[in-house]
């Protein structure tokens, strides 16, 4: 119990780290229409079969405050869960988000799942998108993930150690994607 990390303990000043690339729903939609290359299919399978084993190690690290897995509600939905539960605002940097190969191109070709739209309807009122975020990009942000990565809220001084651990464990897409501020909801810049 001393090492349990919930999705409701993010603190103002924390940085946000994502462990896996995004876009599994987009890739799955393309696969169903036989429009996903063999190389991209291999990446999709590798991502969905990579277990989130570092979660137990991260939970033991001082300065890691909150963890959640990004799954069916997409990145925005799970960021909203952290914001709501922690009574903070989550700010995400769209340019920093790690997309799996060709996901933006596939999404622009219309490979957005119906679940993505339903996700937006469920929580969109709590999300503030920059004017530069297109409807397609919004669909990518709400894209449901199968076996998605972990969204981690940690102190800035701990972030380099978190990223080193993740990269050593084979989480090549792991990167910082935003931070936690005072307020409420989720903002994408």
Mark where each language-model region is.
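Glycine-rich tight-turn/loop motif centered on a GG-T
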Residues: 1-2, 32-44, 87-91, 111-112, ...
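A generic local secondary-structure boundary/capping motif
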Residues: 1-9, 56, 80-81, 139-142
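Active-site glycine-rich loop that binds ribose-phosphate moieties when present
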Residues: 1-3, 39-60, 133
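Glycine-rich anion-binding loops of enzyme active sites
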Residues: 1-36, 178-179
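Residue-level recognition of alpha-helix initiation/capping sites
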Residues: 1-7, 49-50, 74, 157
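Residues on a specific face of well-ordered alpha-helices
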Residues: 11-16, 20, 24, 42, ...
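A structural signal for small-residue-enriched, beta-sheet-centric alpha/beta enzyme cores
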Residues: 22-23, 52, 67-72
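Glycine-/charge-enriched secondary-structure boundary and capping motifs
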Residues: 61-189
């Amino acid at each position: 119990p001393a090492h349990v990390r919930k999705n409701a303990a993010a603190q103002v000043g924390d940085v946000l780290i994502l462990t896996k690339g995004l876009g599994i729903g987009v890739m799955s939609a393309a696969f169903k229409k036989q429009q996903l290359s063999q190389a991209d299919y291999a990446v999709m399978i590798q991502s969905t079969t990579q277990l989130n084993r570092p979660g137990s190690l991260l939970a033991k690290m001082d300065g890691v405050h909150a963890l959640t897995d990004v799954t069916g509600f997409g990145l925005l939905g799970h960021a909203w869960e952290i914001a709501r539960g922690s009574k903070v605002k989550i700010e995400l940097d769209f340019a920093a988000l790690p997309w799996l190969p060709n996901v933006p191109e596939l999404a622009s070709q219309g490979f957005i799942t119906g679940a993505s739209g339903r996700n937006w309807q469920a929580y969109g009122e709590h999300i503030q998108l920059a004017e530069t975020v297109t409807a397609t990009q919004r669909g990518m942000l709400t894209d449901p993930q199968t076996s998605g990565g972990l969204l981690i809220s940690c102190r800035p001084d701990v972030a380099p150690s978190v990223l080193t651990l993740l990269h050593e464990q084979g989480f090549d897409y792991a990167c910082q994607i935003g931070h936690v501020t005072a307020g409420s909801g989720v903002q994408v810049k």
